[in-house]
Amino acid sequence: MKKRAALLVALSLAVVTVLAGCGGKDSSKSADSKDSVATFEEKKEGDTFTVGFDQDFPPMGFVGDDGEYTGFDLELAKEVCDRNGWEFNPEPIAWDSKDALLKSGEIDCIWNGFTMNGREDEYTWSEPYLDNQQVFVVRADSGINSEKDLAGKTVDVQTDSSAEAALKDNTELSSTFSTEIIPDYNTGFMNLESGAVDAVAMDIVVAKYQIESRSAEFKILDYEIASEQYGVGFAKGNDAVKDQVQKTLEEMAADGTLAKISTKWFGEDITTIGK
């Protein structure tokens, strides 16, 4: 019995030792993973440059009539790739998943009417290349002529958008109406056109394009919810690729390419680099 008891004790101690050893390895691996820091390197000729964008955000990025991705921002990004010898890869994303995709490295940047203001410390940014305002769009025959007329009305706003953030910051105004969160602004304009909502809060650059491309009559209220700037957003710390893109954008501004692309999409040069 004593021998049997001694054997059982020895076996128990061995099991505890093994388990403790396993636990130590798992803890170390978790700590290493938690403390690991992503490293960033410059892109080389032949590398792929993946741009994350919302495919329902014309004229910045969307699906053209030919089924191909197109838009002002995508055209800028492609020109940057062509000049650096990179393979351009436009990657449509769900806007509320952009941060996870950027941090995981599945996309190199967010380039899609991406507002810098209020996000300065969350990403590594290019210099601003476009000014923008958040505004309200209503039906021309709605009888809504100012932001005060929105009291008691319903306003569409895209999820995780700058317009949503601006309205949250302006509770004195936003508390006077109801907001409805939508996945994209194409949905917002369909709701507005059908009368399901009374207004859409959105980027003025996108609003003007949407209004021109639709048969229904809309108007932009003479009220600025917020003023902001667009930039190219990279993962925090990715100065290497950001600097490459910034340098190329400055070259495009100097030789007139930025102005040419802007005029194609907006009828005039509204870019801000080098000005």
Feature-to-residue mapping (PLM):
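C-terminal motif of bacterial Sec signal peptides marking the signal peptidase cleavage site
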Residues: T17-G21
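Extended ligand-binding regions for polar small-molecule ligands
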Residues: G23-K25, L74-R83, D141, T154, ...
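Immediate post-signal peptide segment of exported/extracytoplasmic ligand-binding proteins
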Residues: S27-Y69, D82, G143-T154, K275
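Periplasmic-binding protein-like
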Residues: Q55, D131-V138, I204, K208, ...
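Bilobed "Venus flytrap"/periplasmic-binding protein-like clamshell domains
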Residues: Q55-P58, Y69-D82, F114, V135-F189, ...
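Acidic, polar ligand-binding/catalytic clefts
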Residues: L74, K78, E87-D149
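Short helix-initiation/N-cap motifs at beta->coil->alpha
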Residues: L74, N89-L101, T179-S194, E228
